[in-house]
From Swiss-Prot:
It comes from the Archaea. This is GTP-dependent dephospho-CoA kinase. One of its GO terms (biological process) is coenzyme A biosynthetic process. The keyword Transferase applies. Belongs to the GTP-dependent DPCK family.
Amino acid sequence: MNKAIPVLKLPVDFRLSLSIPQGDLYVSPDRGLVYGLRADAAVGDIVSKNHMVEMRITDAKTKRHTVDVGPGECDVLVVNPQGTISINSFTSSLIGGARSICVVGEEDLLVIPFTLVRGFKIIYGQPDVGVVISSPSRERVLKILKGLKPDIVIMNL
């Protein structure tokens, strides 16, 4: 069934700037996985599994391919189309006590509402490079947020 999802969409010209690590980049000496870092929340399936965090935001995908990272619990389920931040995702960032947020769609940009609303230190994967720990200033997050464009995305759910 098709559903209209209100979102803030990432313009194409923003994609390059946000693909650059937005914090401290950690790379393992052998270019393998990085383990054991601490942050308030992790965005991404592999990162969520390998680091110590209070909250996990996952979508059962890595590099756009479905992955099985073991049994997962979902305190909150959100719908978030690729390249967007849905209003549903913003609402989920306000929920206290949630330890696991499962995303139908893509979780990549959800770093933004969780750092803005909760001031979280976030850890996320930098594909084929390493792991980034980010705790940007509120001003930096608001600047990124202002660049997103309101839109409606039709998603088959």
